[in-house]
Amino acid sequence: SGYSYHVMPEVAWGINKNLMVRTSMFVSNSNNQLVAEGASFYTKYRFLSTDDLQSHFRMAAYGRYSFNNATIHQEQIEIMGQNSGFETGIVATQLIKKLAVSASVSYEKAFDNKPDYRFPVAQSDNAMNYTLSLGRLMYPKKYTNFKQTNINTMIEFVGQTLNENGKSYLDIVPSVQFII
């Protein structure tokens, strides 16, 4: 068909205010038919929360394990849809009035993909990931209740440095977020 696409449906559940779990599935048409290529399991535990009126500071630790049965076709490590492996890291978020700033750092390790797609020996199989996100509440200008839809504008810097060869990647991701 000339088009290649990946779909990653996921389900997330906030068990309580400190613990969240998420599972994702990886589906693509990379072999000219729609197939499930793998899945991911994620958990995040908030261990610090300092809340005040119109501001908060929070920190959490997280981990993800993914398995994938697709061919390995890129040097960048990405266990959300491309590689089998794990990731573990921490995230910190500061909210001041309508501005949110979030930063994270994590370690990511890739494994061989099943059934027999070996991770290339010449490539780095582990990396450090880092993000910086800035988001601003655009709507509502003033809350009348907490059931109102939020509209946020955001920009995120998503980076990765491969530990064995020093190569780095940086994506800049602008977005609009709707919280319904």
Predicted region positions:
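Transmembrane beta-barrel domains of Gram-negative outer membranes and organellar outer membranes
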Residues: 1-103, 107-112, 121-180
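Extended low-complexity, intrinsically disordered segments associated with secretion/export
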Residues: 116-117
